[in-house]
Each structure stands twice: as structure tokens, then as C-alpha cells.
């Protein structure tokens, strides 16, 4: 299957989920996330110094995804983003921002942040998406499962738990959500290339802006 075909399938699947109502509706019945308290008075930023990076490209081009690890549309487009990373990852910096909308997505983001503390954000990012059907849309906390992923990755579990439970970790995620709200991001996934918001309905809506930015 070609790269273009894979990307198209991912976009079609995500679009179908939007139509089915999976994109914005959290498990708790809210249509939008509760307004978070911003921890930084300097104003909203699309990318912060502590924002997780999946890759550090050789150019100044930055691809940002606002995601919710429990979001069905994010899961559908996860392979698409992986294809983009395979194609552009050596040249483009891929940044993740959090917008938790579902019942366990905050704790999933905490797990990702705790793994990032040990230099293993990408490994946890993949574990959360690869095992999403195992933990997603559950009514109870999936903390034990997230910790099992950390063990499988080989993290220092004492340090992982310390960062996972640290109020500063939740505050960083809260800041990401506050930035999202200030930037007009209300659903996931939402993509940006060099600060410009994308509205992808076809493969070229993602690849063309990347190509143009790299050529600029």
C-alpha cells in the first residue's frame, strides 16, 4: 500500500469518526473541555520549551498536533502521523500538545510526561496509541495499566511514579489545554505547520504545507 493511500485511509477514517460524533464529545458528556486555569500569564503559545518532541528536524519547520490519547480520531490518524514522521522526521520537528477531553486522557498524558522525564516520551506515546483499545473509554482509572507500559519500556518506576503524581505534571498539561483554548483549538486532532492551522480532508492538505515550508 502506498504512502498516499495510507494517509488517505487515515483521513477518511478520522472524518467518519467526526461525523459519528467521536471527535469532540468527552466521556463525561461535555461538548467542550472545562476552562483550565492558565499557569503562564505571558499569553498562549503554540509550542513551549517543555512541549514534547517526537523528533528534532534539521530545519526550522515545526509540525504540531494537539491530541487526546483517548480520542478515536487521533487513534485513526496515528498511523498517518507515523507515515509523516517517516517521510519528514529528519527535517521537520514534530511537537505534541495535550488537550485531554476524555475520562482517562489526563492520566494518559501524565504517563507520557513521566516517560518524557526519562527521555522515553516517544516510547510511551506509541504504547498509549498501540494499546488504546485496551485502556480507552473505561469508566475506571487505568493507572495500573499505564504503569505496566512504563515497566515494559524499562523506566525507573520510582521516578516514573514521582513525576506522574507531581502536581507540576498536571499543571503542564493544564497549561497545554489553556493554550489550546486561547488558540481556538476545541477538538482533537488539530494540526499546525509553522503556526498555520491545517484543515486536512486529503493527503495533500498535510504534505503540501510541509513541502512548502521546507522549500521556503
Identify the meaning behind each predicted range.
Residues 87-150:
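Structural microenvironment flanking redox-active thiols in thiol-disulfide oxidoreductases
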Residues 1-101, 174-177, 212-216:
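Extracytoplasmic thiol/disulfide redox context detector
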Residues 70, 85-88, 116-119, 128, ...:
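Sec/Tat-exported extracytoplasmic proteins
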Residues 69-72, 99-104, 130-135, 168-169, ...:
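Solvent-exposed loop/turn segments at secondary-structure junctions
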Residues 1-28, 151-216:
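C-terminal cap of thioredoxin/glutaredoxin-like
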Amino acid at each position: 500500500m502506498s504512502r498516499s493511500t495510507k494517509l488517505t485511509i487515515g483521513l477518511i477514517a478520522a472524518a467518519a469518526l467526526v461525523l459519528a460524533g467521536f471527535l469532540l464529545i468527552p466521556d463525561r458528556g461535555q461538548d467542550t473541555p472545562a476552562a483550565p486555569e492558565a499557569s503562564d500569564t505571558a499569553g498562549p503559545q503554540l509550542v513551549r520549551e517543555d512541549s514534547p518532541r517526537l523528533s528534532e528536524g534539521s530545519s526550522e519547520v515545526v509540525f504540531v498536533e494537539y491530541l487526546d490519547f483517548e480520542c478515536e480520531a487521533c487513534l485513526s490518524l496515528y498511523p498517518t502521523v507515523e507515515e509523516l514522521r517517516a517521510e519528514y522526521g529528519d527535517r521537520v520537528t514534530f511537537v505534541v500538545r495535550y488537550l485531554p477531553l476524555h475520562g482517562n486522557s489526563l492520566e494518559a498524558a501524565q504517563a507520557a510526561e513521566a516517560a518524557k522525564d526519562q527521555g522515553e516520551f516517544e516510547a510511551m506515546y506509541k504504547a498509549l496509541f498501540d494499546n488504546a483499545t485496551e485502556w480507552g473509554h473505561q469508566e475506571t482509572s487505568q493507572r495500573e495499566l499505564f504503569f505496566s507500559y512504563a515497566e515494559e519500556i524499562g523506566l525507573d518506576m520510582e521516578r516514573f511514579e514521582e513525576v506522574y503524581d507531581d502536581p507540576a505534571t498536571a499543571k503542564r498539561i493544564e497549561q497545554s489545554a489553556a493554550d489550546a483554548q486561547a488558540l481556538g483549538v476545541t477538538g482533537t486532532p488539530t494540526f499546525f505547520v509553522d503556526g498555520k492551522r491545517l484543515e486536512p480532508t486529503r493527503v495533500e492538505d498535510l504534505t503540501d504545507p510541509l513541502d512548502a515550508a521546507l522549500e521556503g
